[in-house]
Design a protein with these regions (language model features):
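N-terminal "leader" segments that precede or initiate the main folded domain
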Residues: 1-111, 213-218, 222-238, 434-444, ...
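Aromatic-anchored segments of alpha-helical transmembrane domains
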Residues: 10-17, 55-67, 129-139, 188-197, ...
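Hydrophobic, membrane-inserted alpha-helices
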Residues: 8-16, 32-37, 163-169, 185-194, ...
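Hydrophobic alpha-helical segments
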Residues: 355, 359-479
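Aromatic-rich transmembrane-lumenal/periplasmic boundary elements in polytopic membrane proteins
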Residues: 232-340
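Hydrophobic alpha-helical transmembrane segments
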Residues: 28-34, 89-96, 159-163, 371, ...
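Long extracytoplasmic/lumenal interhelical loops at the membrane interface
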Residues: 312-377
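Membrane-embedded catalytic interface detector for glycan/lipid assembly enzymes
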Residues: 98-253
Length: 479
């Protein structure tokens, strides 16, 4: 990893500008952390899942700081807690995670680029067919998962494979020259499907499209810059609209049986609610923006807990992390009587002393692995488990990069698996470790097996090509 002089100068100039504009050192530290986290997680193989995931984590640690500094508008974390120490600890966790990933990536060399490896694993027609079929299969898998709790994690992980198929299709549409109209069509379909579910399922299609474009990104191409800008604006606008309509939409989703069973009815309702929101008073939009920042900036409840530990409640000496590790090494397939994980809302109630909605309301309030590490160990020992998790993520990335030989299969697996494993700062240790291990165990090995199967065909094709280029000499009788 090298730091170019122009990069350091640019970071210094941006930091100085931000400091004088906001008159605050915290945004400068935050931007420096973002730069280092992205720089440390670059894998130099044109797969940007890890850097983008760390950037999204950083957003959840610092969004409110910049929102307040730019607009002057406050959210509960600003006026209701001492948020600054928690932001610093959160940034430290992002950096510890990034350092762990970098250290482990450095210990295993990447595959030799001079060694030939197959590019495409599937034909375009098969890919389109798999994508269309995955749209219908996804709903069925999610519906049956609650009825089979023993296999629920396996089912939901296999359902995640649909995102890999989606990414493969988007990646194919980006190469050799991006087909913007088809990319927009596929992403538009996914956004509609995502916004008509109960949760905000429109984020991943936009992220996957951005990652597909980044693989072929050319800094000298204006269309590529325009695509990144459009994706950013669309993501922000969709987030704002969803935050403005989700309360009414979810109420109707749960109370009206016919509404929940009819996708066309949900599409029409989302359209009507979105139209009404966009025509609302500007002050209502600002309040919705405040709510969106509050939702994404996962600092408020951790900051309240930080004030109470260890003054009111003692450190737990590693109990939370130990329970999370125990949970992942006792899969429900082999331990069907394993109790459910406690809701994050229970931790918020206990450590932040705020009675938030919980499992009894079919919801969970995010608490996050960062504050759990602090409650367990305090500072600076809290950064050790984060660093250790980074080591595991880096080791897994390096392992699958050498094990999966088809470029297309590796890029799809790495993009989906490592994005979903790392991108959320608000996850608890149990959820983050469980998600990561499920993806590595239930999704990774099948991809490796598929890769080996397809390599047989690749080897046969190469042998056939060599035979055509260098035919065996004819045996001739000596004279």
């Amino acid at each position: 990893m090298r730091f170019a002089d122009i990069e350091l100068v640019a970071v210094g100039l941006v930091g100085a500008t931000v400091y004088f504009a906001m008159n605050d050192w915290l945004p400068v530290v935050s931007l420096a952390t973002l730069y280092l986290s992205v720089k440390l997680t670059l894998t130099n193989d044109r797969v940007f899942a890890l850097p983008l995931a760390l950037a999204f984590q950083w957003t959840q640690t610092s969004l409110g700081v910049f929102y307040y500094g730019i607009t002057g508008r406050t959210v509960p974390a600003i006026y209701g807690s001492d948020y600054r120490p928690m932001v610093v600890l959160a940034l430290g966790c992002c950096l510890a995670l990034a350092v762990g990933i970098r250290v482990r990536l450095m210990t295993r060399a990447a595959p030799d680029p001079s060694v030939p490896r197959p590019g495409f694993a599937f034909g375009y027609g098969l890919l389109v067919s798999c994508y269309v079929g995955s749209i219908f299969i996804e709903g069925s898998l999610l519906q049956i998962a609650p009825y089979y709790p023993t296999f629920r994690q396996i089912i939901t992980t296999l359902d995640t494979a649909r995102l890999g198929v989606l990414f493969l299709l988007l990646r194919r549409l980006c190469s050799p020259k991006p087909q913007w109209s088809l990319i927009a069509t596929v992403v538009g379909i996914e956004i509609v499907l995502g916004m008509t579910g109960f949760f905000a399922g429109f984020r991943e299609p936009i992220v996957l499209a951005a990652l597909a474009v980044m693989e072929v990104f050319d800094r000298r191409n204006r269309q590529h810059w325009a695509a990144v800008g459009v994706a950013t604006v669309v993501a922000m606008l969709l987030g704002l609209i969803w935050m403005g309509i989700r309360g009414e939409y979810r109420r109707e989703y749960t109370e009206l049986d016919q509404f929940g069973q009819s996708r066309s009815a949900r599409i029409n309702r989302v359209r009507d609610l979105a139209t009404g929101f966009l025509n609302a008073d500007p002050e209502d939009m600002w309040r919705t923006a405040d709510a969106l920042v509050e939702r994404m900036w996962a600092i408020y409840y951790p900051a309240l807990a930080l004030e109470r530990v260890p003054k009111v409640l003692p450190h737990t000496g590693g109990a939370i992390v130990s329970a999370a590790l125990t949970h992942i090494v006792t899969p429900r397939v082999f331990f069907p009587d394993k109790p459910e994980l406690p809701s994050d809302s229970d931790s918020v109630r206990k450590y932040a002393n705020v009675h938030v909605a919980g499992r009894e309301n079919n919801t969970s309030i995010a608490f996050g692995y960062s504050i759990e590490s602090y409650i367990d160990f305090g500072g600076p020992m809290m950064f050790l488990p984060v660093f250790g998790f980074g080591l595991f993520v880096g080791a897994a990335y390096a392992l699958f990069r050498t094990a999966i030989w088809h470029r297309e299969l590796f890029v799809a697996f790495a993009t989906v698996a490592f994005w979903l494993s790392v991108y959320l700062f608000e996850r608890s240790w149990a959820t983050m470790l469980g998600t990561t291990m499920s993806l590595m165990i239930y999704l990774g090995p099948p991809i490796v097996v598929l890769d080996r199967f397809l390599l047989v065909r690749f080897a046969a094709d190469r042998s056939r090509e060599k035979a055509m280029l260098f035919p065996a000499p004819l045996n001739q009788d000596r004279v």
